Amino acid sequence: MDKKEYFAHETAVIDEGCSIGKGTKIWHFSHIMPNSVIGENCNIGQNVVISPEVVLGRNVKVQNNVSIYTGVICEDDVFLGPSMVFTNIINPRSAVVRKGEYVRTLVKRGASIGANATVVCGNDIGEFAFIGAGAVVTKEVLPYALVIGNPARQAGWMSEYGHKLNFNENGIAVCPESGEKYKLENNRVRKIK
């Protein structure tokens, strides 16, 4: 761990045994715990806790007041909105030790999770999925899916640029920002050339 390759605010706590990528920024009052892995060019906001053995890919943006618990893996280009929550135990009890029962949650490349959303552990988030603010995710989210509400329900599909996709009668949609085309078949979206 070479401090010259990343920035950590003087109030941030970086435990021994972390791997932090070049160009990453860690802001005020954040705590990076042992054996966590943070990729290159990540931004870790204020008051963030990254627990042991968490893995963040490259260019992950973690906004203020997020706790990322053991068992969470975020692939490249993931966005975690302010005060969103991951759980890592299915049935927590204060008097029952469950440290060996952490449940894995995988957030795939390009997914965005909105402010104050909750992701119940064990529910993977697909590539470029978009979790609306305040949503409570209690089941797997498909790639490119837009989910909202409590419990979260699918409300459409999103482009890789974060725009809602409107599919025509042939199952084709165009992102208004990038011009990229998408195909909807069998309740799955894929980008086409």
Model-derived segments and spans:
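Short, intrinsically disordered, charge-biased short linear motifs at domain edges
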Residues: 143-149, 158-167
